Amino acid sequence: MAGSSFGKSFRVTTFGESHGAALGAIVDGVPAGIPLSEEDIQKYLDRRRPGTSSVTTSRNESDKCRIYSGVFGGLTTGTPVMVMIENTSQRSQDYDELAITYRPGHADFGYDSKYGFRDYRGGGRSSGRETIGRVIAGAIASKALDMLGIKVQAFTQSIGNVYAQSLNLDECGENAVYMPDKDAAMRAIELIKEAKSDKDSLGGIIGCIATGVMPGLGEPVFDKLDARLSAAIMSIGAVKGVEFGAGFHVSTMTGSQNNDPFYIDEDDEGLHIRKRTNMSGGILGGISDGSPIIINAAIKPTPSIAKEQDTVNAINEEVKLEIKGRHDPVVVPRAVVVVESMVAITLFDMVLENMKSRMDNVLKVYKDKI
């Protein structure tokens, strides 16, 4: 199966299936000298771990990670970093009836059409547990970005028709849905419980803000920063749309409303070019402009629902289906760290790519050694 690797200079390969023995990631291109421990990675994994609240799946996996290579004495060595976790709470018997039945909204039919064979236990490679490898790599990328003063933070913008009305990012970790608005979070939790009681599910929007990003990241024409970020986020199974800055609202604006006016700002470090607004979401012409990068990702409702649905099977019979097993009534809260990770992976990859864009970057590294 091709398509399990992402990135150029910071190359991430994920492996494993939902009901297989283990999952993880191999990350190549990690510079030597980044402080990294299993605890650093575990903090990220715990944010997507199942079984942590009433609004997530009851599948209770510890998701404890182990670093197998690429780290010595608490620092990355410059060799590929391999991190793996073991699956411990599979209940594969819950999926026996799905061996030949196609679940609506899932990848079953597509996988059968492409490969003529599929791992039907929890979706196999198309399961949300595949994102464990992304979060591992995202934790590593975030450690590197921290050293550059770049911070990436994702959060729940909405669940169903409940939207956050404020952006108090410190409140995200204080509620089960990672919303930056505690009042909206309470309403969202009640809405999730209603959907769960109805044997149904919900979707939502995940927002992400990256601050401290230097101007100049992005490679014209086909590797624009927003193009690479879009590809990264759209590769997450539950994501159905991505927008930057004002997003689709720009279609209703005039040019004078959409254009971000520039001005000169002066501080102790000198003169800086700034923007008065940020309709562009921090990216102009596919290149970062130094403003915060603002992203929204649309997340579809969880397709695994207990409500009866019409479907077909592999022997061309129309059948009724009520999905058993342990599933999230909404994946948005657990997908927050996945979106955050894909943004961090992409930004650090582009930082490394950008090192070769100018000769003075090369001279800063090598001039004293010549």
Question: What does each model-identified segment do?
Answer:
Residues R11, V83, S304-I370:
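Internal helix-turn-beta structural module
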Residues S113-V221:
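Glycine-rich, mobile lid/loop segments that gate access to catalytic sites or pores
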